[in-house]
Amino acid sequence: MKQRRRHVKPKQKFVERVLEFTIESMDSMGQGVAKIDNKPCFIPKTLPGEEGKAILTKASKGVMFARLASLDITADNREESACKHFESCPGCHYLHTDYQSELLYKHQALDNHLKRLTAPVPVVKVVPAEERLGYRNRIQLHYRHKYIGMIDG
């Protein structure tokens, strides 16, 4: 008896498109979140209140991901990164903002996660580090296909 062949739809080629955005909030990973077509769009290296253009890199039914192309309006708390590798390295997520804002965003992310718990949670204080840079002593390498290292999306 012959087996039937499955009909497999050919994959549609993903088309990158330019998006105009206004960042409304930050997620827990330090990415700016904008609403585009009523879907959340995550754009790394952006801050709340910023407006500009981004290039769509991935989209699914309920969420989009994009990379920053240009900023038309920047946030007041945006700073030049102190690390020369910030643009290409996926390690640090908040070096484009001042340290007080970084602590605030991290505190908000922690609060949002803790609010989802059913048990009451005490107020947690975020303690600033003595040094903002130069304290890391390990890295996490990523693997994709045959490549290992710091792989950017």
In which residue ranges do the predicted regions lie?
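Non-catalytic accessory regions of SAM-dependent methyltransferases
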Residues: 1-153
